Swiss-Prot record:
UniProt cross-references to InterPro entries, sorted A to Z: Cyt_P450, Cyt_P450_CS, Cyt_P450_E_grp-I, Cyt_P450_E_grp-I_CYP2E-like, Cyt_P450_sf, Cytochrome_P450_fam2
Binding of substrate, residues: F298, A299, G300, T301, E302, T303
Positions of heme binding: C437
Main location: endoplasmic reticulum
Family: Belongs to the cytochrome P450 family.
GO BP annotations listed: epoxygenase P450 pathway; xenobiotic metabolic process
Keywords, comma-separated and alphabetical: Endoplasmic reticulum, Fatty acid metabolism, Heme, Iron, Lipid metabolism, Membrane, Metal-binding, Microsome, Mitochondrion, Mitochondrion inner membrane, Monooxygenase, NADP, Oxidoreductase
The protein, known as: Cytochrome P450 2E1
Species: Macaca mulatta (Rhesus macaque)
Cofactor: heme
GO terms assigned for molecular function: arachidonate epoxygenase activity; heme binding; Hsp70 protein binding; Hsp90 protein binding; iron ion binding; oxidoreductase activity, acting on paired donors, with incorporation or reduction of molecular oxygen, reduced flavin or flavoprotein as one donor, and incorporation of one atom of oxygen
Expression induction or repression: By ethanol.
SUPFAM superfamilies tied to this protein: Cytochrome P450
């Protein structure tokens, strides 16, 4: 080896030692949770399986314990695994860990709205939005009638399939999308409306793309990948198109606004903006309102739609469960009356199935990232302000002590020995604490009423033998994505 080669090798070696020394000093000075040693630039990327990051978290938790530290690039991440640790983060330290971790794919919504907002306005905007949603019937009788009305449209659309195979992705999605559209815009779309179908396509495509390995990479190395071609560009383009549509609706609402008679949530937000017109510090702006409404539109459509669709696939896999549901529906509701939320008390098996669907699919397995709002002592460790916190929901929903055989779909997980519904505090698909899903009450009502209505009127018929149906997700990242499938719905006599 030449003298120059030896010199370069020594310089590289010294640089590596220096980086290791700096990392150890920083790590020890903060008394962070344990974790694997990070490499320069990429951090612990090689410890993560990009096609199934939750699986990687489980493996690392077995090695380092329920609270451990990772570095993804230069970003410090503390992963919290298991019921006790997750509960402590979300509830016992709800203020300290209430920030929103950065999601670069949604930078168009950063520091605005209620989902991706990590700015000073999110608490006030979220509080007002939740209050307004409750006033418009979120989780109460007002939304029950909304969902029941939409169930009629859904059932009619299903009848029009005439027992022929169809892909349920968008037909099923029309119902929850129309429910949230009514709350936001006081608008009902026809199931064949091209703009309506386009919006649902954008919602669905983004949810799928966010769960791909490329988006996992992009969200952790945005500065390196931003200018490269890739699906992150498609996500951002879709976000911009959705935002443009919502912006047009908000402008239309402003032009016809009557402050004394708000028609929907968008009007209520605009009324607050008008009140602040002469204020030096404004909480509500046109752009902020647009992002808030877009957040609710996306979340209120895609999560419930995907859960319902995944639920239908699971029920076709287990026809004996579907048959038990038919029997309970016939006994409690009968063939004619539309299902009501009061029926849930008399339908423990349906209630258990709805809960088990949500537990089993673990729609957002690693939660949305939180962030430490200040230096915090947690379980004897010091978590610095700005640290990304990942409370893994799948580790709670798949706890094998609370849910024996968690990898199996078993409604009995939510039934006691007498067949009555049994609630579990481990049931946290909507997260908990300051960042709990704003639409939890609405989603729970939609899932029960819409699934009950479908099974009241139809038998589900798969195109293959139930034993051959694969209910494994095709991607596990931001969400758990079900496989595409077709089915037939056969009217019950």
């Amino acid at each position: 080896m030449s003298a120059l080669g030896v010199s370069v090798a020594l310089l590289v070696w010294v640089a590596v030692l220096l980086l290791v020394s700096i990392w150890r000093q920083v790590h020890s000075s903060w008394n962070l949770p344990p974790g694997p040693f990070p490499l320069p630039i990429i951090g612990n990327l090689f410890q993560l399986e990009l096609k199934n990051i939750p699986k990687s978290f489980t493996r690392l938790a077995q090695r380092f314990g329920p609270v451990f530290t990772l570095y993804v690039g230069s970003r410090r991440v503390v992963v919290v695994h298991g019921y006790k640790a997750v509960r402590e983060v979300l509830l016992d330290h709800k203020d300290e860990f209430s920030g929103r971790g950065d999601i670069p794919a949604f930078h168009a919504h950063r520091d605005r709205g209620i989902i991706f907002n990590n700015g000073p306005t999110w608490k006030d905007i979220r509080r007002f939005s939740l209050t307004t949603l409750r006033n418009y019937g979120m989780g109460k009788q007002g939304n029950e009638s909304r969902i029941q009305r939409e169930a009629h449209f859904l059932l009619e659309a299903l009848r029009k399939t005439q027992g022929q195979p169809f892909d349920p992705t968008f037909l099923i999605g029309c119902a929850p999308c129309n429910v949230i559209a009514d709350i936001l815009f006081r608008k009902h779309f026809d199931y064949n409306d091209e703009k309506f179908l386009r919006l649902m396509y954008l919602f669905n495509e983004n949810f799928q793309l966010l769960s791909t390995p490329w988006l996992q990479l992009y969200n952790n190395f945005p500065s390196l990948l931003h200018y490269l071609p890739g699906s992150h560009r498609k996500v951002m383009k879709n976000v911009a198109e959705i935002k443009e549509y919502v912006s047009e609706r908000v402008k239309e609402h402003l032009q016809s606004l009557d402050p004394n008679c708000p028609r929907d949530l968008t009007d209520c937000l605009l009324v607050e903006m008008e009140k602040e017109k002469h204020s030096a510090e404004r909480l509500y702006t046109m752009d902020g309102i647009t992002v808030t409404v877009a957040d609710l539109f996306f979340a209120g459509t895609e999560t419930t739609s995907t859960t319902l669709r995944y639920g239908l696939l699971i029920l076709m896999k287990y026809p004996e469960i579907e048959e038990k549901l038919h029997e309970e529906i016939d006994r409690v509701i009968g063939p004619s009356r539309i299902p009501a939320i009061k029926d849930r008390q008399e339908m423990p098996y349906m209630d258990a199935v709805v809960h088990e669907i949500q537990r089993f699919i673990t729609l957002v397995p690693s939660n949305l990232p939180h962030e430490a709002t200040r230096d915090t002592i947690f379980r004897g460790y010091i978590i610095p302000k700005g640290t990304v916190i990942v409370p893994t929901l799948d580790s709670v929903l798949y706890d094998n002590q609370e849910f024996p055989d968690p990898e199996k779909f078993k409604p009995e997980h939510f039934l006691d020995e007498s067949g009555k519904f049994k609630y579990s505090d481990y049931f946290k698909p909507f997260s908990a604490g300051k960042r709990v899903c704003a639409g939890e009450g609405l989603a729970r009502m939609e899932l029960f009423l819409l699934l009950s209505a479908i099974l009241q009127h139809f038998n589900l018929k798969p195109l293959v033998d139930p034993k051959d149906i694969d209910i494994s997700p095709v991607n596990i990242g931001f969400g758990c994505i079900p496989p595409r499938f077709k089915l037939c719905v056969i009217p019950r006599s």
